[in-house]
Amino acid sequence: MMRRPWLLSALVAWVKLPSVQGEDLFSLGEIDGSLLNGASDACVAAINTKVSCPSTLGLLHFDSDMELDTAEIKELCQGSCLTSLADLRDSVKRTCGSEVTFEDPVSGALWKASYLMEEAIYYAERACLRKGNGQYCNTWFQSAPADASLCDECYKLILWHNAQSPLSEDTSEQKEIYTSASSSCGYKKQPTQTYPPLLVSSPMATPSCSSEYTIKTGDTFLSVSESQRVSTHDLATANRLDSLVSDFPSSGKLCIRNQCDVYVVKSGDTCESIQSENGLSKARLRSWNPFINGYCDNISSYVNQTICISNPLGDYKVPENQDAAGFDTPAAVPDNIAPNTTTNCGLFHNVTAGDDCGTIGLKYSISLDDFIFLNSMIWPNCTNLWLRASYCVAPVGDIADYPGYGPEEDEWTIEPQESTEIAEIPHIGWLNDSRPYVPLANSTREDCWEYLWWNETYAGSPISCREAALGYELDLEQFFLWNPSLDQNEPDAVSPTYDFPCTISPFVSYCMQLASPTPVPKTPRVPPSPRAAGEIANCTRWFMGYFDCASQLSLSRMTMEKMYRYNPSLKEDCSGYTLGTFYCHETLDDLYHYDDALYGDDETSPITSSAPTSTTASSKTSSSAAQPTNVSTDGTCGGAKGKTCLNSAFGDCCSSSGYCGDSLPYCGGGCQSKFGKCDAGSEKISPDGTCGGDKEYTCEGSQFGDCCSQYGYCGRATDNCGKGCQKQYGVCT
């Protein structure tokens, strides 16, 4: 479910929730007076009063539609929680009055003082909605058939609840949706109450214009963008025009700001082609055009629009000292200096949201190599900047005078003689782990795509296991299966439960996501409703239409073409968009056939083989020893227990690291045929990233890349697929 921006910004105000069971005193947020305008000490104390609610209430803040078990529903809905929340809300209204406002620290929006209480009441009431027969809708949704009627009473109750929420800036649209559904389904429309909105004001930035342009006959978004040297997106944003740039005004004046050299995006352009044509790095292209998303897969949305190919904010130079370039004396060392950053530094930069090494280098005119030299904790790919930490961005004096800078110089000379050229040591990309070395928890899976390490320095006290699993959309059974050191059930328990207190450790990391699809849960998740008619098949994730079409496109990081393809009822111009309807934005193809270029080296593109490897059942072979006995029940295989994956719930193939699955990492190179099926020819597919040599491993079809470099390593980068690539052991370009 798509979350509203006010939900995301409100996270700052909520404290981390203790992992407790049952109803207890629960804090909605440790709010100090700095976030409350005009509040007395008594008002601050009232707002920070704890309520008698279970910790489930805090989890609903992250996912208002999370599935609750019977005990959780009973604690939340049949105890004193709702009464306690209502009492606190009324107490805050009496104590604080109508003039006190709560300021959202992220968006700057002002809310009435009772905002946190109303927000919590909304979540609790939504989770406690019940049919006329007494069944809770939360329980009904968990078991409802996929073809359940959209006119079921629970759908009606959800729409009714949304239509009278005081959290909305304007409930009129939700009321229209509820009225329409009541009419089409033929059920009696319950009256909805109208509450005064909680939102007092939302800040509206006033653009700072460097000049104004008077609109002429025949002007278009593109013509004005080109003549005034601004990006089309910024022209629309500065003047609050249609973000789809489909309706240009016929008269008036336009604010012109952030001028730059512009490039008109053509059909077929990619970020890589634009960078190559204009001599730009990806960091510069992205920082000068922040509306291009991190994957650069929405560039086609800006065809026939201008983008910036020079800095729209102007070039920044490090201030020069009158006596010498740079800084003569070290700057004061900040309290939040990053680990392993030199203190002999002329200037520090405090990292804020949106910073990356590209923008920092651009701002302070420092090369990436020099930045890494002064801040040795930074990885070569510079993806581990810490938020709110200070890094050195300028040396004291000449950086070449720093010990260890540059190559060592011999103090003697030798006469040049003929010598044999030594081959360059290969860059083995797959061995260079891009994460900090934090040991895995005991028995945690070692073949995961993503691990979680809780950094106490900036994140505070560790969270509960349930919150960690919820943050990655994992059910608890799956989370504990991958991280068994946290599981408190007896080994081989017949009916394990997961309601025990559990907190993750800040000293180890945990598996949160596999590199390939995980087994389908026993109980399929029921699609949301109402959904758009005629949506694409195999949809796995939806968003609800809360905002206008253009805003929804931006939030979901989809192009209009893709959104229309997934949801034909929208029509090509999005004129069929309906608020309150769920639209598809992710399918099985998105999950199973992701583009390696999105996750790999920024400077590489995916290499496809002319003979794709099939992973269907017909292309797999199994050893005679791999019989459906001693079948794995926990997803592990081989080893001392000798468990087989054949006919298991996790997949028929046993990977080299001893886990069951059905995709390439399990059935390809290194697959253990003694404990399940393997792809035909998998014994020749590289299990460890090496190729050729005595073993004559091939890279094609391996998880490391299809190209075999001249040095005998698999990969997909230019070093592997270009000069010296060994065609007999893989694909070459």
Curated annotation (Swiss-Prot):
Signal peptide: 1-22
Main location: secreted
Comp. bias intervals (Low complexity): 605-629
Protein's UniProt keywords contain Glycoprotein: yes
GO terms for MF: chitin binding
Region listing for Disordered, in residue ranges: 605-637
Family recorded in the similarity comment: Belongs to the secreted LysM effector family.
Name of protein: Non-secreted LysM effector LCP1
Gene expressing this chain: LCP1
